[in-house]
Regions:
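Eukaryotic RNA-binding helical-repeat scaffolds
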Residues: 1-280
Length: 280
């Protein structure tokens, strides 16, 4: 017990010294430190509080990559009981000042964190930040998204699915993402796996009041791929649930748009049976 107490005192003293050094660190080092603390699951409250307060004190020094790292770390540190609200507010304000400096990958990362911080960021600030980052991401893409990484498209789609309020930029993304998927993602040998297609269709469904009806061609093409290549038993429960939601929405989309019912029903039945068997 004596050794345990000595070890605990040493750890507390060590983290106390580290916390005292935080204000002296340059922002890139601060951001890297936040990632390392998260990576090794260091939940020391004193150290995290120092990171929160220092980030809130000098947000104007943060560059896009620093912001991406810090947002990700603070979001994950919520599981330690960290309360990062002051840092999040200051960081979001900084994004609104420097969003044009973000590259495509950095926009994707920041969107992924901001969308998951509902309840910890003011809703109006959250919407403004996501709106600006989405606009910057769209402006960074090549014509027809020919060389846009598929994981970025999927990530942005998932991030936007919880936005709730559609805007002109969201509509631009929806149209471009569905066209991109038809051209590069869904065809046999395309950039998207069966699981990716489920995630994309689910995200499009969540952002579209009429579900998947407006994406009938993409639905038909995707269902063929999903039926042929999906390994439902390897998917998480969340993914299986999304797949069932997509299947239900696909039924309405194919029927309401006047697709050939016999072909559509055969395709849907071929997916529904194994999917529901695994989910149950």
């Amino acid at each position: 017990m004596c050794l345990f107490r000595q070890a605990r005192r040493f750890v507390l003293a060590f983290t106390g010294v580290m916390a005292a050094q935080v204000p002296k660190l340059e922002p890139p080092v601060l951001a890297e430190l936040s990632q390392e603390l998260q990576r090794f699951q260091v939940g020391d409250q004193q150290l995290w509080e120092a990171l929160v307060q220092d980030t809130a004190r000098r947000p104007q020094e943060l560059k896009p990559l620093d912001i991406v790292y810090l947002l990700d770390a603070f979001r994950r540190a919520l599981s330690f009981g960290v309360r990062p609200a002051p840092a999040l507010e200051a960081t979001c304000q900084r994004i609104m000042e420097c969003y044009q400096d973000f590259n495509s990958k950095q926009c994707t990362g920041a969107l992924g964190s901001v969308c998951r911080l509902s309840g910890h960021i003011d809703s109006s600030q959250q919407y403004k930040v996501m709106h600006l980052l989405l606009g910057q991401w769209l402006a960074s893409q090549p014509a027809k998204w020919e060389t846009t990484p598929s994981n970025q498209v999927i990530s942005v789609a998932v991030s936007l699915s919880g936005l709730g309020v559609l805007s002109d930029r969201t509509e631009t993304f929806l149209a471009a993402a569905s066209s991109w998927a038809l051209r590069w993602g869904a065809p046999e040998g395309g950039a998207l796996s069966a699981e990716d297609l489920v995630v994309l269709l689910w995200s499009l469904k969540e952002m579209t009041p009429l579900g998947l009806a407006r994406y009938r061609e993409l639905v038909q093409l995707s269902l063929v791929r999903i039926r042929a290549a999906a390994t439902y038993e390897d998917w998480t429960l969340v993914r299986q649930g999304q797949a069932l939601e997509v299947l239900l929405s696909a039924k309405h989309a194919l029927v309401e748009d006047g697709a050939d019912l016999a072909v559509a029903e055969e395709l849907l039945l071929g997916i529904e049976a194994p999917m529901t068997a695994v989910a149950s």
